A protein has these predicted regions:
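Cys/His-rich short segments
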Residues: 1, 6-9, 13-44
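Catalytic center-proximal scaffold of phosphoryl-transfer enzymes
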Residues: 26-303
Length: 303
């Protein structure tokens, strides 16, 4: 390292902006000369937006519970002694997201190459939940998808609507070891999340990598996945595991797909846990409705 003198900078913290001087060093690595600020690295000052780690944490906590980056800007401004523009907030989130994405890619890569060290933690069961949220694409992503849709419409000689809404599914996955009682509530034990606009196989491989690197898989006797019935949530079920539709989505489909005068039949069977009677009830209702196509099609979702 070569000492190249002091350089002044500033950093945003939750207590306000702080100005300071730190040494700039010049270092040569593999024939390439670059400058580094060791104090910045020690203090974990992010390069993008010059924000302290505690302010970055505040941004990460704020953005998911606000409607937009502009709203997050307002919240940061009123709950801390500093201010960040909505563009700086966006850059911080993008940078953190890129780091997480790269880390997850590396986990999958090491798992595929059998280079992960097997875990030793012993548990008898692992539980998983999978669901999706459809969101509107914006900016560059929307333009790219619109262009693809336009080309497809031209190939198929169909009409193209440039103002159409472009949606994609944000997939969510959580894995945990069980529940523990805390006062009147139950909290999940060692919950771990995966979230992103990802392919199902990417979620499954990342999940498998984490299970392999944390647990002694020979000791796990039960793998159970709860989902909304979507094809991808069933497809990521662990080998030898069981898949079940969670009660919220079962009730949702009963309300949506079963004629109102018959709903209580199914709700009562579920509440009494008389699950073996549900399929005969579905078959009986199909007969009662005289096999009407649309009604039967909806009832098939309950099977």
């Amino acid at each position: 390292y070569r000492h190249k003198g002091l350089r002044e900078t500033s950093v945003n913290t939750i207590m306000g902006e702080i100005k300071y001087k730190r040494v700039m060093y010049e270092v040569k690595e593999e024939g390439i000369t670059k400058t580094v600020y060791l104090l910045d690295e020690t203090l974990k000052i992010s390069e993008e937006g010059k924000a302290s780690s505690n302010l970055v944490e505040k941004v990460i906590e704020t953005v998911p519970v606000t409607d937009s980056y502009r709203k997050a800007e307002e919240v940061i401004d009123t709950t801390t002694n500093t201010s960040l523009s909505h563009e700086k907030i966006r850059k911080i989130i993008v940078k953190i997201g890129d780091k997480i994405t790269n880390k997850e890619k590396e986990e999958r890569k090491l798992f595929d190459k059998n280079q992960l060290v097997a875990g030793l933690k012993e548990v008898t069961a692992l539980f998983e939940e999978a669901d999706g949220i459809w969101i509107n694409l914006q900016g560059k992503d929307r333009k790219e998808r619109l262009e693809k849709n336009k080309q497809k419409a031209e190939r198929e000689n169909k009409e193209f609507n440039p103002k159409m809404k472009i949606k994609t599914e944000l997939k969510l996955h959580v894995m945990y070891e069980g529940w523990k009682k805390e006062d009147s509530r139950h909290s999940l034990v060692n919950k771990q999340y995966i979230a992103g606009i990802m392919k199902p196989k990417e979620i499954a491989r990342l999940r498998d990598a984490r299970v392999f690197s944390q647990y002694d898989e020979s000791k796990i006797k039960l793998r159970a996945t709860n989902g909304d019935g979507a094809k991808w949530t069933k497809g990521i079920t662990a080998k030898g595991g069981i898949y079940q539709k969670d009660q919220f989505h079962i009730m949702q489909e009963i309300v949506r797909d079963v004629p109102i005068e018959y709903r209580n039949i199914f709700i009562e069977l579920i509440n009494k846990k008389e699950f073996e009677k549900i399929q005969p009830a579905i078959d009986g209702l199909k007969y009662e409705l005289n096999g009407e196509y649309q009604a039967v099609k909806k009832l098939n979702k309950l099977e």
